[in-house]
């Protein structure tokens, strides 16, 4: 296996996957076969891209990702590509992220952008209604997919560039580490249906109804919530 997997320095629940520069070099040619426009309009090309990615890693990368994401003890992976060359530009990162996503499954359609993925900037000032674009706004406890009809199992986010700023790491909390989980997941209110809607920028014109807490296949609590 030509990539390495280790525990993240901050949490054993997070697995770090290191992709070496030499292997990324082998992706440059197959990635150039697919333009960003082609990926946006031809769903099959995304699966083809993912196949090329997996073949570089002897078809072991997909198995590793699926195993990590399906293991409740982890469920999170940080992919760390060794990128020290200008040939690994923003388009390359979009393609790499696309390949990783399609090794796991078929991503949901993003209504906000009208594409299979969303791409945006976090700036010093922002007038939108999206917390994701506001540099100094803390995100409250939430799960993605709360207000859409599609089932949302996983989320992939890619930091493509930083200018005039350092840090900007994502903040995540494993549900089993939440100190209020037992209390709230067993409260009858958490089992009742709530109506969920989204801000205008998301371009979703319907509302959904479901409880905050449900159970997974092993009877452990899951959560679908956004404030």
Question: Residue locations for each model-derived region?
Answer:
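Preference for protein termini
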Residues: 1-2, 65
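Active-site environment of non-heme Fe oxygenases that use a 2-His-1-carboxylate facial triad
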Residues: 2-57, 72-73, 120-227
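N-terminal, charged low-complexity regulatory/assembly segments
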Residues: 43-50, 67-87, 92
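Well-ordered, non-membrane alpha-helical segments in soluble/globular domains
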Residues: 57-63, 90-100
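Short, charged beta->alpha transition segments
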Residues: 62-66, 143
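A structural signal for short, well-ordered beta-strand segments and their strand-loop junctions
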Residues: 77-80, 110-112, 156-158
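A gly/proline- and charged-residue-enriched helix-loop-helix capping module
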Residues: 98-132
């Amino acid at each position: 296996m030509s990539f390495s997997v280790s525990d993240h320095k901050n949490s054993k629940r997070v697995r770090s996957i290191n992709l070496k520069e030499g292997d990324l070099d082998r992706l440059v040619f197959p990635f150039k076969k697919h333009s960003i426009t082609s990926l946006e309009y031809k769903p099959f090309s995304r699966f083809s891209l993912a196949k090329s990615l997996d073949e570089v890693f002897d078809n072991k990368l997909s198995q590793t990702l699926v195993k990590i994401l399906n293991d409740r003890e982890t469920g999170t992976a940080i992919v760390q590509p060794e990128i020290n060359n200008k040939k690994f530009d923003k388009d390359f990162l979009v393609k790499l992220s696309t390949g990783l996503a399609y090794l796991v499954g078929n991503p949901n359609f993003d209504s906000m952008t009208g594409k299979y993925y969303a791409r945006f900037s976090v700036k010093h000032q922002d007038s939108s209604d999206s917390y994701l674009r506001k540099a100094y706004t803390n995100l409250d406890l939430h799960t993605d997919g709360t207000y859409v009809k599609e089932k949302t199992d996983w989320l992939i986010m890619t930091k493509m560039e930083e200018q005039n700023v350092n840090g900007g790491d994502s903040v995540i909390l494993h549900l089993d580490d939440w100190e209020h989980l037992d209390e709230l997941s067993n409260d009858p209110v958490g089992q009742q249906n709530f109506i969920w809607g989204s801000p205008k920028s998301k371009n979703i014109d319907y509302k959904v109804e479901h409880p905050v807490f449900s159970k997974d296949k092993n009877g452990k609590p899951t959560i679908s919530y956004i404030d």
